[in-house]
């Protein structure tokens, strides 16, 4: 570059920094880049691996969508529990007015430390979310759900009034404001969304999500969660078999998927995932019905091994760390937010 061009560029950069602050523009030479993307674990080892970076990326928008009773809120509460365990501060914007503190506590959420808002309108919910994000004091915000973000005009209007595109415009405007603040404050914002059917679709999937297209574009990660079956013991149903597909991923390759069990009253079966993924990665050895680790037998049958791992959390954490290291997705947590319980699952 010639001297004249260099001087002109230096003057322009100085003017930008003077007007908008230091760091408003920078060279991508590596010195200013984050060495590792900070993430918050989903509470599911398989999903952390499928995401390619070890969890949900901070400073980004994530959308989790699926049919009713598929595990959307459970997955979010598991992530909240993981964030709190590492010293994070979380907020839950409950637009559906259906938050269950008893269930959340069973999943390991410290309910007394969780900030809960139950707004009256969609505008109020998104304004609360924006204010929390801009404060810089929140690590994770969950909005449950986009479908329940009802515009004020619709609430104040009469039943049967037409309000075409109001919610989509509301979401589009809010996300334009939120995106920059989310990146600057390194906050994770998770939107839970529902599925609707498009009428008259002959080819392709008739399914779509609520709130227009803005959330699809602004989301760095989109997760499609589905219930694939039931977990039974005799005639008693103990939980759901769940599959999550990574539909969109801006931080790693997309279209991967994870399968795990959600047990009623317990949440995601982390120990069950350790067994399945551990066997797949040759960290746990399986011979017939017997499972062994480091040459020592740890149980006969998956259920017995699951119980054994619950009783021996230090071994479970060791297996988890080995699986993450083998797959190259070790979590990078903000310095200074970890506490002495890091790596341990919340006890029931």
Swiss-Prot record:
Q: Where in the cell is it found?
A: Cytoplasm
Q: Name one GO biological process term.
A: DNA recombination
Q: Name one GO molecular function term.
A: ATP hydrolysis activity
Instruction: Tell whether DNA damage is among the UniProt keywords.
Output: yes
Q: Which family does it belong to?
A: Belongs to the RecA family.
* Purpose: Can catalyze the hydrolysis of ATP in the presence of single-stranded DNA, the ATP-dependent uptake of single-stranded DNA by duplex DNA, and the ATP-dependent hybridization of homologous single-stranded DNAs. It interacts with LexA causing its activation and leading to its autocatalytic cleavage.
The molecule here is called Protein RecA
* The organism of origin for this protein: Neisseria meningitidis serogroup B (strain ATCC BAA-335 / MC58)
Lineage in the entry? Bacteria, Pseudomonadati, Pseudomonadota, Betaproteobacteria, Neisseriales
**Chain's gene name:** recA
């Amino acid at each position: 570059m010639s001297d004249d061009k260099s001087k002109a560029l230096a003057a322009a950069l100085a003017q930008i920094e003077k007007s908008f602050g230091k760091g408003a523009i920078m060279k991508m030479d590596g010195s200013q880049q984050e060495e590792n993307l900070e993430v918050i674990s989903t509470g599911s080892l398989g999903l952390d691996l499928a995401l390619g970076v070890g969890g949900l990326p901070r400073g980004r928008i994530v959308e989790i969508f699926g049919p009713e009773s598929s595990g959307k809120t459970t997955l979010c509460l598991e992530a909240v529990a993981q964030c709190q365990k590492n010293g994070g501060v979380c907020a839950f914007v409950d637009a559906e007015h259906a938050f269950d503190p008893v269930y959340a506590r069973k999943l390991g959420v410290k309910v007394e430390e969780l900030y809960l808002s139950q707004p009256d309108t969609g505008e109020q919910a998104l304004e609360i979310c924006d204010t929390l994000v801009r404060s810089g004091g929140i690590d994770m915000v969950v909005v449950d759900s986009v479908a329940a973000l009802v515009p004020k005009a619709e609430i104040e209007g009469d039943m049967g009034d037409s309000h075409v595109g109001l919610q989509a415009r509301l979401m589009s405007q809010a996300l334009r404001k939120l995106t920059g603040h989310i990146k600057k404050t390194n906050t994770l914002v998770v939107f839970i969304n529902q599925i609707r059917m498009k009428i008259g679709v002959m080819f392709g999937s008739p399914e779509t999500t609520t709130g227009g297209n803005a959330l699809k574009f602004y989301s760095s990660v989109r997760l499609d969660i589905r219930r694939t079956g039931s977990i039974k013991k005799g005639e008693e149903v103990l939980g759901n078999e769940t599959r999550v597909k990574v539909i969109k991923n801006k931080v790693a390759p997309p279209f991967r998927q994870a399968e795990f069990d959600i047990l009623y009253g317990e949440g995601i079966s982390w120990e069950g995932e350790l067994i399945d993924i551990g066997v797949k990665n040759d960290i746990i050895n399986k011979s017939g019905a017997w499972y062994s680790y480091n040459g020592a037998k740890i149980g006969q049958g998956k259920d017995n091994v699951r119980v054994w791992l619950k009783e021996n959390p230090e071994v479970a954490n060791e297996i988890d760390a080995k699986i993450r290291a083998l797959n190259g997705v070790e979590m990078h947590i903000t310095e200074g937010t970890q506490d002495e319980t890091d790596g341990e699952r919340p006890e029931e």
